[in-house]
Amino acid sequence: MYQKLQAPTLSSKEAAIQLLSRRDHGQYELYQKLALKGYEEADIEAAINFCLDHNYLDDLRYAKSQVRQHVYKGHGERRIRQELKQKRVAESIIDMAMAEEPQDWFELARMAAEKKFKGIKAKDQKEYAKQVRFLQYRGYSFDQISYALSFEDED
């Protein structure tokens, strides 16, 4: 039922470079992936240090990439911050990434609401609560949600 981990065929540095060639990873994420492949902790640390020294691994670049990706998906600032914290990106790096990728969160919330609800204003309290929950899940603040839901159906 359970398979025993086989000894990896690539060195930890080669495996790290191979993973980073596909897409950017955070330091912790790369550590986890290498550990799952069965590499020793010392080898993983050496591979991560090698990647950091050669600028193959950069948490700021990774965080900025994640911010762009989440904004494209219609996620708000709170959700993006939470996702990056789960991937153990430092708070200072998250702040820098958010500052370097400026967004109008109010307009993004409005666009997300418009896309989901087709510009239709809630008819009753239950429907309004559903719209608020959707935008909260997406990571928008209450001010942003109020702004987004204040627009009337313009048809």
From Swiss-Prot:
GO terms for biological process: regulation of DNA repair. Its main location: cytoplasm. Keywords: Cytoplasm. It is found in: Cytoplasm. GO terms for cellular component: cytoplasm. It comes from the Bacteria. Belongs to the RecX family. PANTHER family: REGULATORY PROTEIN RECX FAMILY PROTEIN. Modulates RecA activity. This is Regulatory protein RecX. It comes from Vibrio campbellii (strain ATCC BAA-1116). The gene is recX.
